[in-house]
From Swiss-Prot:
Residues 1-21 are annotated as: Disordered. This is Large ribosomal subunit protein bL27. The keyword Ribosomal protein applies. Disulfide bonds: none annotated. GO terms for biological process: translation. Belongs to the bacterial ribosomal protein bL27 family. Keywords: Ribonucleoprotein, Ribosomal protein. The gene is rpmA. One of its GO terms (cellular component) is cytosolic large ribosomal subunit. It comes from the Bacteria. Pfam families: Ribosomal_L27. GO terms for molecular function: structural constituent of ribosome. InterPro entries: Ribosomal_bL27, Ribosomal_bL27_CS.
Length: 83
């Protein structure tokens, strides 16, 4: 066993807390107004119809309905359509 830690080993051993990002409600999922659909960093996916965006880029439903993902002009959008 080494009596001294190897060079740099004492400076390792940290990790950041989990951020729980990603899609929270998938395609065709029924959501109520205010339900978080996606948590993200930046506009990886843009808000479509009946979807709002929080200041941390969280996308959430503005109405009750079904979630629908679509691509337009090389951009991904998520929309909520009423039943």
């Amino acid at each position: 066993m080494a009596h001294k830690r190897s060079s740099g080993a004492g400076r390792n051993g940290r990790d950041s807390n989990p951020k729980y990002l990603g899609v929270k409600r998938g395609e065709n999922a029924f959501v109520r107004a205010g339900t978080i659909i996606i948590r993200q960093r930046g506009t990886k996916i843009h808000p479509g119809q009946n979807v709002g965006m929080g200041r941390d880029f969280t996308l959430y439903a503005l109405i009750d309905g079904k979630v629908h993902f679509e691509t337009r002009n090389n951009r991904k959008y998520v929309s909520v359509y009423a039943e």
